[in-house]
Swiss-Prot record:
A motif (Q motif) lies at residues 58-86. The keyword Transmembrane does not apply. GO terms for cellular component: nucleus; pollen tube. The gene is RH36. This is DEAD-box ATP-dependent RNA helicase 36. Residues 289-438 form the Helicase C-terminal domain. ATP binds at residues 102-109. Residues 1-56, 471-491 are annotated as: Disordered. The lineage of its organism: Eukaryota, Viridiplantae, Streptophyta, Embryophyta, Tracheophyta.
Amino acid sequence: MEEPTPEEEGGITIMSKSRKNPKTVVNIQSQKLDSDQNTPQFEKFTNPNPSSDTTSATNFEGLGLAEWAVETCKELGMRKPTPVQTHCVPKILAGRDVLGLAQTGSGKTAAFALPILHRLAEDPYGVFALVVTPTRELAFQLAEQFKALGSCLNLRCSVIVGGMDMLTQTMSLVSRPHIVITTPGRIKVLLENNPDVPPVFSRTKFLVLDEADRVLDVGFQDELRTIFQCLPKSRQTLLFSATMTSNLQALLEHSSNKAYFYEAYEGLKTVDTLTQQFIFEDKDAKELYLVHILSQMEDKGIRSAMIFVSTCRTCQRLSLMLDELEVENIAMHSLNSQSMRLSALSKFKSGKVPILLATDVASRGLDIPTVDLVINYDIPRDPRDYVHRVGRTARAGRGGLAVSIITETDVKLIHKIEEEVGKKMEPYNKKVITDSLEVTKVSKAKRVAMMKMLDNGFEDKVKDRRKLKRKTLADKGLLKKRGKRQKSTEN
C-alpha cells in the first residue's frame, strides 16, 4: 500500500484510514518528520500486565515532581503512582511528546495533569495548556481534577464547550487562564470568529488530547486543523487513550524522534468481580423486561443502575416511560441542554436519583464511583464500547452486574463481544411475564412517552439534528463515506 504523505509541517502525524481514502492525514505536531528513516523514531514501552508491574515507583517523589505536588497527591489519597503515571510523568517532565495507552481508571488524567502543573508552577502564565476532549461532561470533569491537583497554585482553569454563551467564553479566553479545557467544535468556532482568540494560544506549552482515539476521529479533522494552526511549534503534544485505533497506530508509524509511547495492553478484558448476564427476548418485549430487571433492584440490594442505549430518541423515550411507571430516573444525552446534562450526572453521582439512562456519552472517562448495575438496552456494535460500558460497575475491587437485553439481530454482536473479552455471558434468571395487566401497563406508558415527545417538540429536535449532521458531513465531504452509519444513527 502506498505510504501516506505527511502534510507540510510534518511531525507526529495521524492518518485517518478509510477504505475509500487511505491517505487522509491529520497533522497534530509541528516538529519535522524524517520520512527517510526506515526505523520508527520513537521509544516504546509495552506493559502487558500493569497490575503486576514491578517497575512502578513506590512514591510520587520518585517521579521528579515538586514537593507541593507530592503533598497534594497525599492529601487526595494518592499514595502510590499507577503504572501509567510512573512511566509517563518523568518523560513529560523531560520535554518528550507522549502517547499513553491504558485502561479506564488507570490514572491517565493525573499522568498528564501533574507534570503540566509542575511546569506551570515554575513559569506561570496563560494559556499554558490546551486540553481537548470529545465530550462536554469529560471537559468539566477534567477541570475538577486539574483544580484538585493544582489547589495550592491559585489555578485559573476555563472550560470551553458547546451549549454555553460564546461571548462569556471569549472573555474567559482573552483573560488568559492557565488551563483551557475544550471540545473540538466550540473552540474551532471561537478561533475562527474572533480575531482576539488565536493570539491567546501563541505561547501554549502543552497540547493534550484526552480520549485521543475519539478526538482523532475523522469527523474532527477540520476542528483539529484549526486548533493546531494557532499553537506554537515548540509545544509538547500529549495523547492519552484507553484503546488503540488505526489513527493511533499511524501515530506509532509516523512519529518524531522525541516521542515516547507507553502501552498497557491487557486486551479487552473485564474484571473478575463483574457478573455478565443476558436476557434473550423479542424486540417488542425489550421495554417489558427492562422494567422487570429494574423492579428487582431492591430485592437484589442494587442501589444504582446505568442503562445504555444507542440513540437520544430511545434514551428520552425510556426515561419518559419510566416516569409514567413512577420509576425514578434521569436521562443524559446530547439533545439535552448542557445544564440538564450536568444536573443529571450530579444527581446520579450523589445518589439522589438511582437510575441514569444514557447514550455512550457516559460510557467512558466519567468518574462515577459506585454503580451496581449496568444494563445494555441496546447492544454496542464494537466490543470496546461494551467493555467501556460495563466498566462503569465492579470498580476498585467491588462486585457488579451487567445485563444485556438481546434480540435475534444481536446474536452475532454478542458472540463477537464474548470472543473479544474471553468470557461467556450467563442467562439472567428472569420470570416469563404472562400477566396481561403488567404488559398493558408498560405498553400504555410507552405510548404516553411517545406522545409526550411529539407534543414537547423532541421529535422535531431529532429531525433537526439529523439534517444538521447530514449537512456537516456533506460540507466535509464525508456523507458518502459514512452513509451506512448515518442510516442507523438517530442522534
